[in-house]
Amino acid sequence: MYDDGPRKGKPGGLSMDAATAAGLAAVWPEYFPEESEFAADGRSARLAADLVDLFSSPDASDLLSRVEDDGDILSLPVDFQQLSNLTWITEALQENPKEALLSMGAAVHLIVCASRDLQLGDINKINIRLYNHTKTIALKNLKAAYIKKLVTVRGTVLKVSTVKPLVLQLNFQCMKCATKFPRVFCDGKFSPPVSCSIQGCKSRTFIPMRSTAKLMDFQKIRIQELASGESHEEGRVPRTIECELTEDLVDCCIPGETVTVTGIVKVLNNYMDVGGGKSKSRNQGLYYLYLEAISVRNSKVHAASGNSDAASGSFGFQAFTEKDLEFISKFKEEHGADVFRQILHSFCPSIYGHELVKAGITLALFGGVQKHSIDQNKVPVRGDIHAVVVGDPGLGKSQLLQAAAAVSPRGIYVCGNTTTNAGLTVAVVKDSMSNDYAFEAGAMVLADRGICCIDEFDKMSAEHQALLEAMEQQCVSVAKAGLVASLSARTSVLAAANPVGGHYDRAKTVNENLKMSAALLSRFDLVFILLDKPDELLDKRVSDHIIALHSNDGGPFTANKRIRTVPQFNPSTEFGVGRTSLASRLRLHPEKDKDFCPLPGPLLRKYISYARSHVNPRIFMPSPAADSLQKFYLDLRKQSDSADGTPITARQLESLVRLAEARARVDLREEVTLEDAKEVIDIMTESLYDKCVDEHGVVDFARSGGMSNQKQSKKFLRALNEQCDLQKKDCFTMNEMYNLADRISLQVANLDAIVESLNNAGYITKKGSSMYQVVTSSYQGSQATWSGR
């Protein structure tokens, strides 16, 4: 935007005129309170004079018009890339960033007052908020060499403290001679005068004049390095750094948000007056690094400024270079309609088969479109897709989740048996220094706008209730220690669980196999069930695949070929469309795809991030895609009416819409097509069939929740025993049993089958054509004991 002109090299190439010198001298105490007087020949003064000349040019009028007035606080966002051609400014920012930014603020102060016909004292200090500054630095590289340097870091907000006033300047009055001494506290370090400087008065007692205090809003945040970043090291505790926010920067972020912080690296003495002797002297030399924030950029700032990308589910400031955009364009152009299959097989290539399960997880990675996320007058509709994989041990469920967390631009992987309720949602911790309570984000909040993979989901039954709100309302409400707040948790939950007993029992429902409530299970858009059944041909291919992975001597297709491992079946035609067609289309062919090479993880991560940031597909009404989804949903509702329960609700229709939007996002399309709807129906049919089929292969929609026939039989037998005690008899007719089943709301399709199973098990005995005796009743037992006497 600007060029050097006559100031190539160091600042001070032009002489300072009298008007500029007088103006800078008037505002200088506001920006440099620690300096006793304005020195026109000083380095900072000469830099400020050059900046006054620069900002007086017509090119700078657009920049100065962006001065933000937030009450008594004025700030000016400045894009560093617009000043990158001015070497004298970049050198000044590199040598002494604090001095350069204050000089820039003083220069802007003069120009703004002149352009608005204001007196220099009519406006307060203007803070320069420099953003888009060079390349971000990994937290592991932030060491002593960067002290007093200007850096940019990215991370997830882990903790936010309360806003407090910080004293910058205060007058003290001597108790003996009543002389007033102004004191300036650099970096907020409170340092009262030691002794009175008046001759003849050596008093050491001073009274702070609190009415003269100059205050500033102050807040501390802690950011943590991104878990999915390229610089992240496995097995190491994630690095964190404290950031100090002041004035207009306070309350600009909440726990769980991804922020880009530009600031000056500073050090603070970690000395605490504890212990004694050698330990005390050793602690005096310890320092820790922290950032004095100059600017903070996050999704909330972008959304407030009208940027729709932040509100549409972006992963937050994912930078795309020209090479990245060229790769995305060429990849889409080269594969065309086959992009979904290419991405699906690039995701977790070490797992053999499971095409439809991988398809569901891939759609969850791309996600749907969130509606009404910014409008406060409407209820937000979530766009994130939740999926759970249930099955026997050893089928690769954990590897699928780890692969999803690895390729996601923002993914977090946790294990259920080591996760607490607070660690999953949000915790309230007490700061040891200030004794204040603050929020500390858990896994769901840290995975905001990303993926949260929860393994061993069945081992954390106590924490299931904490997920109900986070999965549907996309937020976590907390009311602890006097703090009441709601934190965003716009994340897709991918869960993996082992059934009770180690083996999935088709005779039981999904709820009974997992010990999961029906309310939580209904929040999952997709439920996949993997069964381990012996198959000679399939086992041979799986063993070949595993050996090829370990030997590393196979061809490119040997280690990456896919053959479906889920047993095939033939669902009834009235249940829905055939679901083997999509699996066969997604499967790699040994001949046609022998040269298939998976997409590398970093490139796949870039593609997913671009799709979520810039592609927002919609379903138009009327359209073939909308008609197809509506017809499938109405058919499911019609079939579920015949069952005792009604598990097919509007949530299934919303799930279909989200999946269809995610399928369109994979192909970078803005409109959902009929082919997208058909593929989504195939995946949904797979999920519904696995969830609702019983041990005989019969589809029963009531099995998606509630109790199995075994539990219903126990409930019916318990009711019979109670009736024996109440009515003083142990024989019942079939009509009486039918009436009893209605009274206890027994949810079975065939009561005769339940009665027959109880008869075969010996709990009841048939005494006639329609008469049964309850053998297990206490009434029958007491009668037998009396007759024996």
Curated annotation (Swiss-Prot):
A motif (Arginine finger) lies at residues 522-525. SMART domains: AAA, MCM. GO terms for biological process: DNA replication; double-strand break repair via homologous recombination; female meiotic nuclear division; male meiotic nuclear division; pollen development. It catalyses: ATP + H2O = ADP + phosphate + H(+). It is an enzyme of class 3 (hydrolase). Residues 339-546 form the MCM domain. Its main location: nucleus. Its EC number is 3.6.4.12. GO terms for molecular function: ATP binding; ATP hydrolysis activity; single-stranded DNA binding; single-stranded DNA helicase activity; zinc ion binding. A zinc finger (C4-type) spans 174-201. One of its GO terms (cellular component) is MCM complex. It is found in: Nucleus. ATP binds at G391, D392, P393, G394, L395, G396, K397, S398. Keywords: ATP-binding, DNA damage, DNA repair, DNA-binding, Helicase, Hydrolase, Meiosis, Metal-binding, Nucleotide-binding, Nucleus, Zinc, Zinc-finger. The keyword Zinc applies. Belongs to the MCM family. Probable DNA helicase that may play a role in DNA repair durin meiosis. This is Probable DNA helicase MCM8. It comes from Oryza sativa subsp. indica (Rice).
